[in-house]
Amino acid sequence: MDSGSSSSDSAPDCWDQVDMEAPGSAPSGDGVSSAVAEAQREPLSSAFSRQLNVNAKPFVPNVHAAEFVPSFLRGPSQPPTLPAGSGSNDETCTGAGYPQGKRMGRGAPVEPSREEPLVSLEGSNSAVTMELSEPVVENGEVEMALEESWEHSKEVSEAEPGGGSSGDSGPPEESGQEMMEEKEEIRKSKSVIVPSGAPKKEHVNVVFIGHVDAGKSTIGGQIMFLTGMVDKRTLEKYEREAKEKNRETWYLSWALDTNQEERDKGKTVEVGRAYFETERKHFTILDAPGHKSFVPNMIGGASQADLAVLVISARKGEFETGFEKGGQTREHAMLAKTAGVKHLIVLINKMDDPTVNWSIERYEECKEKLVPFLKKVGFSPKKDIHFMPCSGLTGANVKEQSDFCPWYTGLPFIPYLDNLPNFNRSIDGPIRLPIVDKYKDMGTVVLGKLESGSIFKGQQLVMMPNKHNVEVLGILSDDTETDFVAPGENLKIRLKGIEEEEILPGFILCDPSNLCHSGRTFDVQIVIIEHKSIICPGYNAVLHIHTCIEEVEITALISLVDKKSGEKSKTRPRFVKQDQVCIARLRTAGTICLETFKDFPQMGRFTLRDEGKTIAIGKVLKLVPEKD
C-alpha cells in the first residue's frame, strides 16, 4: 500500500509516459495530474486500505460501464490502482463510450483471459499487474486492428472520441458525433497513398444535366447511398434537417448540395462533386445546376465530363415545362454535345409520381418527344443514347431492377454504367490539363481533369499561356495521394514556381517539349442555334472553350456552309441568321489557350453565349498568327 502511495508522486501527464513504464511494475496515477493525486492520497488510503479484495469483485461491470465516474470513486472497483486511481482512470477513459474497453492505454504485452484476474485477485502483486495489463493490451491503440476499431465505433453509441470527458452527452449529440465519425472514416479511407505501380480503375466523369427540379441532385444522393459513399445515419440526419425546413423530399440532394443557400432554395448553383465506385470503374459525379442563370457553371461541368446523364421529370406538366421553349432540357443536351460528351443516358425520373404511376405510355411519350431533338443536336439514337425509367427518391431501377416496371428489360442505372465500354485515352499523348480552379494551401494548388498524357511527382511542367515553369510537388487524384496519374483523372496538383494570383481558370498545364497553342485570333465553323436578329461582323459574345471563358468579337464572316452538301459559298456573306452554318474569324479580348478541333477535340470545341442564351456552337479550324 505504501509503495503504491509513494509512487503516485510521479504521476505522468500524458499517455506517452505510461507507454514508457516498465511492464512488470504496478503503475499508479496515470490518469490524473500529480497535484490532484497528492490531494486525494490521504482520503483514499484511509477509506480503502483494508477492503481491497472485497471491493474488487465488481471489476467486470465497471469495464462495461457506459458513464463517466471520477477516478477516486472508481478506485474500489480496481484494487491494484488505489492511491492515485491510475487503473480507474484508464478504465474511465475507456468506459465513457467503449463498453469493451476500446480506448487509451498502450501498456504491457500480457494477454490473460478476462476471468483470470478475477480469480487471482487475492494473490500477490503479479495478479495486480495482470489485472492492470489485461485491458491495456487488449485495448491498446498499437495492437488494435483498424477494422475492429471502426466496427465498434459504428456499433456502440460513442461519447466524445477525443478522451471521453463528457459521458453524459445527450442522444442528439451522440448521433451527430457518430455521423461525424462515419464521415471521418470515409475520408480516412481516401487518404491512403497509392503506390505508382498499383492497378487503377478507369476514371469516368459523369455530368448530371437537365431542367431545374428534374431530380438531378436527388439521383446523385441516391447513388451515393446505394454505393455506400454516404451512410444511413448521415442520410437520416439530412432527412431530419430537411423536415425541419419543410423540405422532406430534398434530403437526398443534400449529399451533393452542401452549400446552405443551395439547401434553403433547393437549387444547385455550383457544380457539385462526389465519387463512387463500381467493380470496374471509378466515377466522379458532376451535378450541374439546372437553373438558366447558372448555365455557365453547367458548361464548366460538362467540359470535364466523359458521359452525360440527362434527367427528365415524367411528372405531368414538369416534362413539358422543361422541354418546351425556354426550358433547360434542350439547351443542356446541346451544350453537353458541344462539350464533347459522347454517351448520353436519359433517365426518365419521378416515375413513382401519382400522375405517372410507372406508366409505360408516359415513358414512351417522353421518349418520342426527345429523340428527334437529340438527333438534331448530333447524338445517334442507336449508338449514343440510352433511355431508362427510374425514381430518384425511392431508388427504384437505380441499382437494382424494379418490380414496378416489368416492361423495362434493360440493366438498371449503376450496372449499366459499370458495363460501358472503356474510353480510349492516350497515355502517350501531349500533357494537357485545363485548370478549373486554384487556391493556396502550403503552396499553389490547381484543380482540373487531365485530358491527355501522364503526370508524375517531381515533373517539370509549363503553365500556358504565360509560359511559367513549374514543378509538381504533390498530386491528389480524387483526394487520394499518388505519385503518377493517367488521362481522365480529376486532380489537385500542388505546384512550385508560381503564385496562385498568376493563374486563371482556362490556363493549361503542358509538357515543356510540347506546349499547347495560344493566341487571340482564329478561324472557326459555327452553327447559329438561337438568335432573333441577324449577326454581322463586329458582333460581341462570350466564348466558352474547355474551362476558359473570354469575351470575343466576330471580326469577319468568311463564307456560308451548306448544311447538306458541306459546300462553302464563294462570296463573303454580309450577315448570318438562325440555323445557318458559317465560317468566321473570331478575336478574343485576351490571349487564350486552344487547339484546332482536328488536332485535339477537347480543346477545339466551343460555345458562344449572349444575354443568358446559347446562340452558337462551333469548332476551331485554324489558328491565325498575331501580326507584330
Swiss-Prot record:
Keywords: Cell cycle, Cytoplasm, GTP-binding, Hydrolase, Nonsense-mediated mRNA decay, Nucleotide-binding, Protein biosynthesis. Residues 1-10 have a biased composition (Low complexity). The keyword Nucleotide-binding applies. Residues 349-352 are annotated as: G4. GO terms for molecular function: GTP binding; GTPase activity. Residues 201-425 form the tr-type G domain. One of its GO terms (cellular component) is cytoplasm. GTPase component of the eRF1-eRF3-GTP ternary complex, a ternary complex that mediates translation termination in response to the termination codons UAA, UAG and UGA. GSPT2/ERF3B mediates ETF1/ERF1 delivery to stop codons: The eRF1-eRF3-GTP complex binds to a stop codon in the ribosomal A-site. GTP hydrolysis by GSPT2/ERF3B induces a conformational change that leads to its dissociation, permitting ETF1/ERF1 to accommodate fully in the A-site. The keyword Cell cycle applies. CDD domains: EF1_alpha, eRF3_C_III, eRF3_II. The gene is GSPT2. Its EC number is 3.6.5.-. Residues 210-217 are annotated as: G1. It comes from the Eukaryota. GTP binds at residues 213-218, 349-352, 391-393. Residues 1-44, 71-124, 146-191 are annotated as: Disordered. It is found in: Cytoplasm. Residues 391-393 are annotated as: G5. Belongs to the TRAFAC class translation factor GTPase superfamily. Classic translation factor GTPase family. ERF3 subfamily. One of its GO terms (biological process) is nuclear-transcribed mRNA catabolic process, nonsense-mediated decay. Component of the eRF1-eRF3-GTP ternary complex, composed of ETF1/ERF1 and ERF3 (GSPT1/ERF3A or GSPT2/ERF3B) and GTP. Component of the transient SURF (SMG1-UPF1-eRF1-eRF3) complex. Interacts with UPF1 and PABPC1. Residues 287-290 are annotated as: G3. Residues 266-270 are annotated as: G2. This is Eukaryotic peptide chain release factor GTP-binding subunit ERF3B.
